[in-house]
């Protein structure tokens, strides 16, 4: 699997993304306010820090004493007490789960970059095994009119085979490969949770231009 990709945005677009991430952060802080959170894993941390929106959510949870990064990129940010150079879709040993398990696990804009639907299920299953209290997964909505990866409107609404073929034809071969971009709908998220028999979750909507742009899936362990 290729490295989880961080998009270099124009400042205008990054400003929009930043505003949306501020909304997400409010929801996350609200859902965590009753919990004594001493440890956190950030899944899919990006090494690309030039966008103001990059790693925005975890940077604004820096009050948590012990923050760990799990990423297939080399992370140098001193925010993280431990940096695990590993894809979240890889196998974890029982010892790794025991050692790394944290109060909460957060993953923002990562699940759409891990490849197939089976890989997305594996990612969520690994996350549940790394979580003590809650996990939070944030991902773009496939059915928002604009895909902020390609900046092309509506094309991603086509069947995925056709969408990927057109991306390849117009020179966006990176995004044409499932291993690099596999957008999800709300129904896809629900199916993942159902396939894993996880019931105790909520999905929050973030809107942009009147359409749902992102989903925040929050699962409560206990």
Label the predicted regions.
Residues 1-35:
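Class I SAM-dependent methyltransferase Rossmann-like catalytic core
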Residues 150-153, 160-179:
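Short, glycine-/aromatic-enriched active-site segment of Class I SAM-dependent methyltransferases
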Residues 201-222:
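Core SAM-dependent methyltransferase catalytic element
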Residues 16-24, 49, 119, 181-188:
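Soluble or luminal CAZymes and related metallo-dependent hydrolases
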Residues 176-197:
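Short alpha-helix
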Residues 35-144, 219-220:
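Conserved SAM-binding loop
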Residues 134-162:
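Conserved class I S-adenosyl-L-methionine
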């Amino acid at each position: 699997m290729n490295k989880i990709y961080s998009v270099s945005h124009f400042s205008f677009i990054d400003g929009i993304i930043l505003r949306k991430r501020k909304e997400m952060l409010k929801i996350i802080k609200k859902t965590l306010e009753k919990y004594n959170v001493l440890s956190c894993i950030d899944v899919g941390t990006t090494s690309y820090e030039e966008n103001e929106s990059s790693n925005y959510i975890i940077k604004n949870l820096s009050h948590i004493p012990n923050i760990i990064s799990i990423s297939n990129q080399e992370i140098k940010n001193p925010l993280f007490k431990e940096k695990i150079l590993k894809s979240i879709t890889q196998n974890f040993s029982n010892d790794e789960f025991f050692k790394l398990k944290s109060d909460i696990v957060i993953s923002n804009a990562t699940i759409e970059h891990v490849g197939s639907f089976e890989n997305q299920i594996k990612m969520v299953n690994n996350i549940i095994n790394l979580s003590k209290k809650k996990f939070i997964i944030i991902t773009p909505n496939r059915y928002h009119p604009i895909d902020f990866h390609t900046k092309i409107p509506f094309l991603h609404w086509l069947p995925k085979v056709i969408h990927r073929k057109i991306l390849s034809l117009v020179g966006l071969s990176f995004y044409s490969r499932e291993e690099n971009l596999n957008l999800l709908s709300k129904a896809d998220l629900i199916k993942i949770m159902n396939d894993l028999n996880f019931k105790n979750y909520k999905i929050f909507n973030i809107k942009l231009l009147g359409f749902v742009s992102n989903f925040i899936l929050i699962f409560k362990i206990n």
